[in-house]
Amino acid sequence: MSRRNAAVKRPILPDPQFNSRLATMMVARLMQHGKKSTAQRILSDAFGLINERTGGDPLELFETAVKNATPLVEVRARRVGGATYQVPMEVRQERGTAMALRWLVSFSRARNGRSMSQKLAGELMDAANEAGSAVRKREETHKMAEANKAFAHYRY
């Protein structure tokens, strides 16, 4: 690890189409092999489908979905005297959002058939309604942290 100053975090610029930082982060997670325009098209198509099906603002639904999938606590492995403990720790807001977006994208990809924009739209609508795989993953993460509460004093 470098002994110099901490790396400066680059500011995330809002997406030109939706004027949202969260949309920019989602495009980055959707992108494969540097194909940003394809990722942007997938997101805008998904938002179009959401608008068709719900009639509401897709950006609002997207923000709700991310909020519902964001974990508050997680477990991290900590080695103490030859034993490895799963230590529950709070998740910083930035990391929680990144985890939620990663889960939403990976579970969208895992859905059956259809185009990626349809799968993403379905996962986002499910997450906004407190359902779906990403929300279930968050609940599992919280349960793991609750089960390992006894090791909370090993926090670092």
From Swiss-Prot:
CDD domains for the chain: uS7_Bacteria
GO CC terms of this entry: small ribosomal subunit
Keyword tRNA processing belongs to the record: no
Bilayer-spanning residue ranges: none
InterPro entries xref list: Ribosomal_uS7, Ribosomal_uS7_bac/org-type, Ribosomal_uS7_CS, Ribosomal_uS7_dom, Ribosomal_uS7_dom_sf
Pfam families: Ribosomal_S7 (PF00177)
GO MF term set: rRNA binding; structural constituent of ribosome; tRNA binding
PROSITE patterns in alphabetical order: RIBOSOMAL_S7
Keyword flag Manganese: no
Any single GO BP term: translation
Keywords: Ribonucleoprotein, Ribosomal protein, RNA-binding, rRNA-binding, tRNA-binding
HAMAP family hit by this protein: Ribosomal_uS7_B
Functional note: One of the primary rRNA binding proteins, it binds directly to 16S rRNA where it nucleates assembly of the head domain of the 30S subunit. Is located at the subunit interface close to the decoding center, probably blocks exit of the E-site tRNA.
Entry's family note: Belongs to the universal ribosomal protein uS7 family.
Subunit (UniProt): Part of the 30S ribosomal subunit. Contacts proteins S9 and S11.
Protein name, per record: Small ribosomal subunit protein uS7
Source organism: Synechococcus sp. (strain CC9902)
